Design a protein with these regions (language model features):
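Short, glycine-rich nucleotide/cofactor-binding loops
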Residues: 2-14, 32-38
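Short, basic, glycine/proline-bearing loop/turn elements
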Residues: 1-4, 27-33, 67-70
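C-terminal structural segments of small proteins and small subunits
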Residues: 65-97
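Short internal beta-strands
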Residues: 27-32, 54-61
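A short, acidic, amphipathic alpha-helical segment used as a generic capping/interface helix at domain edges
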Residues: 13, 39-46, 79-82
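A general structural motif
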Residues: 1, 25, 52, 90-91
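N-terminal beta-loop-helix "entrance" segment that forms/cooperates
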Residues: 35-50, 68
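Short, conserved loop/helix-junction motifs that constitute active-site signature segments
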Residues: 20-24, 46-52
Length: 97
């Protein structure tokens, strides 16, 4: 059980590596440029969803990117307090940047 935070572009090596290590017991929070990994129809959003991990996207970053209506199904928007609450549940975290 691991929290992955992804704030790099979906085209980055870090984003691909993150997807290869995910399990169904993990959680992913997309923020910064990482929110683009949640775009409906993208290969990486499919990899994320296929992993079985819980996937969240930081709402202020989604809104700033202008992709609020384009997130893939199964990716939940969260605010900053929810980001902190989720982070507090995980003793181990892997930051992908």
């Amino acid at each position: 059980m691991l929290l992955h935070t992804l704030n790099s572009s979906p085209q980055s090596v870090a984003a691909r590596d993150c997807c290869t290590l995910l399990t169904g017991e993990d959680t992913v929070i997309l923020f910064g440029d990482g929110v683009y990994a949640g775009l409906e129809g993208s290969a990486i959003s499919q990899l994320l969803r296929d992993s079985g991990a819980a996937i969240f996207a930081l709402a202020p970053d989604v809104d700033a990117a202008g992709i609020g209506t384009k997130l893939a199904a199964g990716i939940s928007r969260i605010d900053y307090p929810e980001f902190v609450a989720i982070s507090a549940q995980y003793p181990r975290q892997m930051a992908w940047y």
